[in-house]
Amino acid sequence: MVHQVLYRALVSTKWLAESIRSGRLGPSLRVLDASWYSPGTRQARKEYQERHVPGASFFDIEECRDTTSPYEMMLPSEAHFGDYVGNLGISNDTHVVVYDGDDLGSFYAPRVWWMFRVFGHRTVSVLNGGFRNWLKEGHPVTSEPSRPEPAVFKATLNLSLLKTYEQVLENLQSKRFQLVDSRAQGRYLGTQPEPDIVGLDSGHIRGSVNMPFMDFLTKDGFEKSPEELRAIFQDKKVDLSQPLIATCRKGVTACHVALAAYLCGKPDVAVYDGSWSEWFRRAPPETRVSQGKSGKA
């Protein structure tokens, strides 16, 4: 069997700092701040304007999505994504490094990492430890806005990394894919509410396994080692040699499952983009499981 050589999914703060110092930023290397925070908490764009990694552009996940969809954070079209990242100076030959400023060390960056991959881009990495550790280690920051020269990016959707509602519904019968839910246990069980949203009860898709995405991160905000990640999958009886779909509430933290599996040598985890936000509104009641007061989500 021929093993696929995987592009490095993580780069260190030290590597990025040295790359910036040595003048490597440009058409061949771009940095993106993909921070996003719940309304009424922190303001991602304002924080970016105040301080960011030198040369980084702001990737606004609210803009680079399907704004016509009734569901949260759905993927944009190929043309939309290509135009958006092209305007950030990214071409099909660019190595893209993504970070965010979340206190956990990483939250939205893996979503943007996955978005690039699902649109056919191989050379994309997450900054391990995020902006939290960039600051902690004393690396330089700036308020200088980034003005990269626009580039041409041709997006080609890789459908093998994306699952739809219909495919997940069919999978309840065929069981061809394992299904992992990356939300916190209380939300998965239905005993804690979904935050920042009205009309969406908590619970999970029947047959899914709960693997909270925070378990993939160390207390210092770094990705755990491949050995530790494999042990987490094994503990949950998730077989990395078999097909796997990741889900969450809106297709964001599910990408942490895809990243963790990738770091274990499995690059083909698909994300259910609509996730619980869509499933709750569309799926038959018997496919929604909850330990909440109603017994069903």
Swiss-Prot record:
<dbReference type="GO" id="GO:0035928">
    <property type="term" value="P:rRNA import into mitochondrion"/>
</dbReference>
<feature type="modified residue" description="N6-succinyllysine; alternate">
    <location>
        <position position="136"/>
    </location>
</feature>
<feature type="modified residue" description="N6-acetyllysine; alternate">
    <location>
        <position position="14"/>
    </location>
</feature>
<dbReference type="GO" id="GO:0030855">
    <property type="term" value="P:epithelial cell differentiation"/>
</dbReference>
<dbReference type="GO" id="GO:0004792">
    <property type="term" value="F:thiosulfate-cyanide sulfurtransferase activity"/>
</dbReference>
<feature type="domain" description="Rhodanese 2">
    <location>
        <begin position="173"/>
        <end position="288"/>
    </location>
</feature>
<feature type="modified residue" description="N6-acetyllysine; alternate">
    <location>
        <position position="175"/>
    </location>
</feature>
<protein>
    <recommendedName>
        <fullName>Thiosulfate sulfurtransferase</fullName>
        <ecNumber>2.8.1.1</ecNumber>
    </recommendedName>
</protein>
<feature type="modified residue" description="N6-succinyllysine; alternate">
    <location>
        <position position="219"/>
    </location>
</feature>
<keyword id="KW-0007">Acetylation</keyword>
<dbReference type="GO" id="GO:0051029">
    <property type="term" value="P:rRNA transport"/>
</dbReference>
<feature type="modified residue" description="N6-acetyllysine; alternate">
    <location>
        <position position="224"/>
    </location>
</feature>
<keyword id="KW-0677">Repeat</keyword>
<feature type="glycosylation site" description="O-linked (GlcNAc) serine">
    <location>
        <position position="35"/>
    </location>
</feature>
<feature type="modified residue" description="N6-acetyllysine">
    <location>
        <position position="236"/>
    </location>
</feature>
<dbReference type="GO" id="GO:0008097">
    <property type="term" value="F:5S rRNA binding"/>
</dbReference>
<dbReference type="InterPro" id="IPR001763">
    <property type="entry name" value="Rhodanese-like_dom"/>
</dbReference>
<feature type="modified residue" description="N6-succinyllysine; alternate">
    <location>
        <position position="237"/>
    </location>
</feature>
<feature type="modified residue" description="N6-acetyllysine">
    <location>
        <position position="163"/>
    </location>
</feature>
<feature type="modified residue" description="N6-acetyllysine; alternate">
    <location>
        <position position="237"/>
    </location>
</feature>
<feature type="active site" description="Cysteine persulfide intermediate">
    <location>
        <position position="248"/>
    </location>
</feature>
<dbReference type="GO" id="GO:0005739">
    <property type="term" value="C:mitochondrion"/>
</dbReference>
<feature type="modified residue" description="N6-acetyllysine; alternate">
    <location>
        <position position="136"/>
    </location>
</feature>
<feature type="region of interest" description="Hinge">
    <location>
        <begin position="144"/>
        <end position="159"/>
    </location>
</feature>
<feature type="modified residue" description="N6-succinyllysine; alternate">
    <location>
        <position position="224"/>
    </location>
</feature>
<keyword id="KW-0694">RNA-binding</keyword>
<keyword id="KW-0597">Phosphoprotein</keyword>
<dbReference type="InterPro" id="IPR045078">
    <property type="entry name" value="TST/MPST-like"/>
</dbReference>
<feature type="modified residue" description="N6-succinyllysine; alternate">
    <location>
        <position position="175"/>
    </location>
</feature>
<feature type="modified residue" description="N6-succinyllysine; alternate">
    <location>
        <position position="14"/>
    </location>
</feature>
<dbReference type="GO" id="GO:0005743">
    <property type="term" value="C:mitochondrial inner membrane"/>
</dbReference>
<dbReference type="Pfam" id="PF00581">
    <property type="entry name" value="Rhodanese"/>
</dbReference>
<feature type="binding site">
    <location>
        <position position="187"/>
    </location>
    <ligand>
        <name>substrate</name>
    </ligand>
</feature>
<keyword id="KW-0808">Transferase</keyword>
<feature type="modified residue" description="N6-acetyllysine; alternate">
    <location>
        <position position="219"/>
    </location>
</feature>
<dbReference type="GO" id="GO:0005759">
    <property type="term" value="C:mitochondrial matrix"/>
</dbReference>
<comment type="subunit">
    <text>Monomer.</text>
</comment>
<keyword id="KW-0325">Glycoprotein</keyword>
<feature type="modified residue" description="Phosphoserine">
    <location>
        <position position="38"/>
    </location>
</feature>
<feature type="binding site">
    <location>
        <position position="250"/>
    </location>
    <ligand>
        <name>substrate</name>
    </ligand>
</feature>
<comment type="function">
    <text>Together with MRPL18, acts as a mitochondrial import factor for the cytosolic 5S rRNA. Only the nascent unfolded cytoplasmic form is able to bind to the 5S rRNA. Formation of iron-sulfur complexes and cyanide detoxification.</text>
</comment>
<dbReference type="InterPro" id="IPR001307">
    <property type="entry name" value="Thiosulphate_STrfase_CS"/>
</dbReference>
